[in-house]
Amino acid sequence: MAFLALGINHKTASVDVRERVAFTPEQLVDALQQLCHLTESREAAILSTCNRSELYIEHEHLGADSILAWLANYHHLSLEELRASAYVHEDDAAVRHMMRVASGLDSLVLGEPQILGQMKSAYAVAREAGTVGPLLGRLFQATFSAAKQVRTDTAIGENPVSVAFAAVSLAKQIFSDLQRSQALLIGAGETITLVARHLHDLGVKRIVVANRTLERASILAAEFGAHAVLLSDIPAELVNSDIVISSTASQLPILGKGAVESALKLRKHKPIFMVDIAVPRDIEPEVGELDDVYLYSVDDLHEVVAENLKSRQGAALAAEQLVSVGAEDFMSRLRELAAVDVLRAYRQQSERLRDEELSKAQRMLANGSNAEDVLIQLARGLTNKLLHAPSVQLKKLSAEGRVDALAMAQELFALGEGSTDKTPQ
C-alpha cells in the first residue's frame, strides 16, 4: 500500500504548460482507465482545473517516473519538460497534500471554496471510471472531512476572494463606475457564475452570457437578470462590451485578434477590459497587443489576489494544523487496517483451539469426571496450546540473537518490567 500525488500547478508551471497538461472532461474516464492499465496503478483519480492537473494514485510498488512518463506521453510533452514543472508527494506527504488542496491552502486564491467541489467531481469521475477502490475511496472521504472542518473551525473562508473576485476587483480599478459598464461573460461554469454574481452585486448596467449551448446560458442569465447568447454571437456583442471575462473548457481559442479589432473600430476605440481565466486560453494572446485592450490571464491576477488575501493568513496557520492532524489520523487508521487480516487469522486459530479443548472437556464431563478437575484441565490445556507457537518462535528468535524481536514481543504482550510472576518462597 502506497499513495502518490503527482502533478503541476500555478506555482510550478506557466499557463502555457498548464494548458498543455490539462484534461478535458471528455478525456478523464478514458485517461484514468488507460493510466491504471499501462502503469499497473491499483487505484487512480485525476484533478484537472485551470490552475492544476494532479494524479492521485494508490499502488504497491510503483515509481513516480513511470507515472510522469505516462503523463508526458499522454499530452505529447517531453519527459524533461514535464519533470521541470512537476512535483511528487508520497504516502503521508501525499495525504497531507490532498487535504491542503481540498481545503484551499494550495490554491492561487488562499481558501477559495471552489476547489473542494472540483475535488469531489474528480472523485465522482474516478468512481464512474471504476478506478477508485477502498483505499483511495477512504482517502477522498477523509480529505472531504478535513476540508469541511477547516471551513467550519477557521476563518479561511471569510472575506470571500477567488479568481472570479480578483477579476472583478481588477475591473473596478479600471472602470470607476461599473454601473455604466456592460459585461460579456463567456462560458457558464462555476467560475463564470461567481463572476456574474459579483458583477450583479456591484450593479453592472448589463450582463450578457455567451455559451456553447443556449440552454445553459439561459439558466445562468435568468439567475442574474442577464441576456443569453450563443458563442457565435460574440462578435456582435463585443461592440457594446466594456468588460469581457472568459472561462470555458474549449481546447481552441474562442476570441481572436481580428474579431476584437473589428469591434474596437465600431466602438471608436473605446477600451475593452478582458480577463482570460481559462486553461487552455480562450482569448488569443495576440489580442493583448491591441492598443485599446487590457488583457489579463490567470497568471496576471497574482498581485490582485495577494492584496485581497491578507486577512486570511492568520486563519491559514490554524487550517494547516487541522490538516496535519487529519492526515496523521488517516494514516494511523490506515496502518491499523494492515493488522486486521493478522488479527482475524489469530482469532480464528484461537477459537479453533478453544473449541478443541471445550469438546475434550465436554466428553470428560459426559464420562463422569469431576467438574473441578475438568475445568482445571481445560484452563491448563487452553493456556498451553495458545502459548505453544509463540513460545517456539520466541526461543528460536532468542537463539538467533534477535533482541529487537524479543523487545517487540514484550511490547506486543504488554509485559512491562516486573510483570513476570514469581513463585512464592
UniProtKB/Swiss-Prot annotation:
Q: In which pathway does it act?
A: Porphyrin-containing compound metabolism; protoporphyrin-IX biosynthesis; 5-aminolevulinate from L-glutamyl-tRNA(Glu): step 1/2
* Record-listed substrate binding positions: 49-52, 107, 112-114, 118
Task: Give the reactions, separated by semicolons, that this protein catalyses.
Answer: (S)-4-amino-5-oxopentanoate + tRNA(Glu) + NADP(+) = L-glutamyl-tRNA(Glu) + NADPH + H(+)
Return the InterPro entries for the record: 4pyrrol_synth_GluRdtase, 4pyrrol_synth_GluRdtase_dimer, 4pyrrol_synth_GluRdtase_N, GluRdtase_CS, GluRdtase_dimer_dom_sf, GluRdtase_N_sf, NAD(P)-bd_dom_sf, Shikm_DH/Glu-tRNA_Rdtase
Q: Which GO terms describe its molecular function?
A: glutamyl-tRNA reductase activity; NADP binding
- Note the NCBIfam families from the entry: hemA
Q: Which GO terms describe its biological process?
A: protoporphyrinogen IX biosynthetic process from glutamate
| This enzyme's EC code(s) | 1.2.1.70
The record's active-site residues are 50
Pfam family for this entry, one: Shikimate_DH
Additional facts recorded: During catalysis, the active site Cys acts as a nucleophile attacking the alpha-carbonyl group of tRNA-bound glutamate with the formation of a thioester intermediate between enzyme and glutamate, and the concomitant release of tRNA(Glu). The thioester intermediate is finally reduced by direct hydride transfer from NADPH, to form the product GSA.
The keyword Calcium belongs to this UniProt entry's keyword annotation: no
In which residues is NADP(+) bound?
187-192
Residues of the site described as Important for activity: 97
Q: What is the lineage of its organism?
A: Bacteria, Pseudomonadati, Pseudomonadota, Gammaproteobacteria, Pseudomonadales
Q: Kindly provide the name given to this protein in its UniProt entry.
A: Glutamyl-tRNA reductase
**Signal peptide segment:** none
Self-association or partners: how does it assemble? Answer: Homodimer.
**What is known about what this protein does?**
Catalyzes the NADPH-dependent reduction of glutamyl-tRNA(Glu) to glutamate 1-semialdehyde (GSA).
Gene designation per UniProt: hemA
